[in-house]
Amino acid sequence: VLSPIPSSRRTQRGRQTYSRYQTLELEKEFLFNPYLTRKRRIEVSHALGLTERQVKIWFQNRRMKWKKENNKDKFPSSKCEQEELEKEKLER
């Protein structure tokens, strides 16, 4: 993979772990609104002691998780599930 930044300058970031309190507050905020304005993102990041970037990425990841969970019913995740759905349709 080619990168515009030389490998000697790239830094590998570790995985961010959030405290229970931070996760709870982020989840509450997400339930209220899955999309944050920049102003609200700044407020949340200051209140939780996180960077704006961390909050932004947490929300992006959470929206993808929500999307996957809600599409589970609509799209079978395996061939076996697909066959079961087709079988049910034929029985109707």
From Swiss-Prot:
Alphabetized, the UniProt keywords read: Developmental protein, DNA-binding, Homeobox, Nucleus, Transcription, Transcription regulation
Q: Which CDD domains match?
A: homeodomain
Q: Where do the record's region annotations for Disordered lie?
A: 68-92
- Please, one GO biological process term? adult locomotory behavior
Q: Where in the cell is it found?
A: Nucleus
A Pfam family matched in the record? Homeodomain
**Record feature DNA-binding region, as residue ranges:** 11-70
Report a single Gene Ontology molecular function.
Answer: sequence-specific double-stranded DNA binding
- Choose one Gene Ontology CC annotation of this protein and give it: nucleus
Tissue localization of expression is: Predominantly spinal cord and kidney.
The record, for InterPro entries, names: Antp_homeobox_TF (IPR050948), HD (IPR001356), HD_metazoa (IPR020479), Homeobox_CS (IPR017970), Homeodomain-like_sf (IPR009057), HTH_motif (IPR000047)
Please describe the quaternary structure of this protein: Forms a DNA-binding heterodimer with transcription factor PBX1.
The UniProt entry's sequence similarity note says: Belongs to the Antp homeobox family.
* Protein role: Sequence-specific transcription factor which is part of a developmental regulatory system that provides cells with specific positional identities on the anterior-posterior axis.
Q: What is this protein called?
A: Homeobox protein Hox-B8
Report the gene name: Hoxb8
